[in-house]
């Protein structure tokens, strides 16, 4: 099995909206805590490295060598699909280059804007299948398909960010080799354990504070003169 340098390569159009979504997804992926059971089944303790080119490069005949190398050394290609990306010559070249050494199953589509049939690259919307013709011979035919995508469409950046937080599990499930439902359940369990740990810590502090307050009150009862000694001195009888 090939050892990859990057867990994923994020391909996107370098306009403000697409770049924002790519950056948000990048952060979530690299900071995601993989539940222990998923770690055991996937063999991954965390998402180590995600490649995201931050600069728009000039159009040339060939992709830059570092981009080609990063694509070849990435296990998955995360494609941010939008009207801008489908028009981007760079994005289309990145998809074509990736598919030279990877399968279509390793391309993870993210629907940022527009309708799937208008923003997904055509190469991802068809697959070749063997079919038998009327005369009994076998032939290869193209069948239209719609790739499964994480839908992060939103009316503004705030809504898009929220959608990314929700839909990132669909992408992570593919990267970790498990189902979305399994990862979502493990994620909920992990979140619940964290919440219980926090509540346990708060409860512990509350108990300590209560004991301390109780001890202080007992000291007051036993030695009231320690609280305001000046008051008791004022009322000492004079003989």
Please tell me what each predicted stretch does.
Residues 1-34, 49, 55-73, 83-89, ...:
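C-terminal interaction surface of TIR/SEFIR-family domains
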Residues 79:
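Redox-cofactor binding/interface segments in oxidoreductases and associated redox assembly factors
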């Amino acid at each position: 099995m090939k050892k990859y340098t990057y867990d994923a390569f994020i391909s996107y159009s370098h306009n403000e909206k697409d770049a924002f979504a790519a950056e948000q997804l990048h952060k979530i992926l690299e900071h995601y805590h993989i539940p222990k059971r998923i770690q055991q089944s996937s063999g991954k303790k965390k998402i180590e490295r995600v490649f995201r080119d931050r600069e728009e490069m000039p159009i040339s005949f060939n992709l830059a060598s570092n981009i080609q190398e990063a694509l070849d050394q990435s296990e998955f290609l995360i494609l941010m699909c939008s009207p801008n990306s489908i028009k981007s010559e760079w994005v289309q070249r990145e998809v074509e280059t990736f598919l030279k050494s990877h399968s279509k199953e390793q391309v993870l589509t993210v629907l940022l804007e527009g309708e799937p049939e208008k923003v997904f690259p055509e190469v991802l919307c068809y697959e070749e299948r063997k079919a038998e013709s009327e005369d009994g011979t076998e032939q290869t035919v193209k069948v239209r398909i719609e790739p499964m995508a994480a839908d992060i469409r939103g009316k503004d950046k705030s809504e898009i960010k929220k959608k990314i937080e929700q839909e990132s599990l669909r992408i992570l499930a593919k990267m970790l080799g498990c189902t979305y439902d399994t990862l979502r359940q493990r994620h909920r369990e992990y979140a619940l354990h964290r919440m219980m740990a926090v509540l346990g810590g708060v409860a512990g502090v509350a108990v300590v504070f209560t004991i301390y307050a109780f001890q202080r009150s007992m000291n007051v009862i036993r030695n009231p003169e320690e609280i305001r000694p000046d008051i008791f001195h004022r009322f000492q009888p004079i003989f």
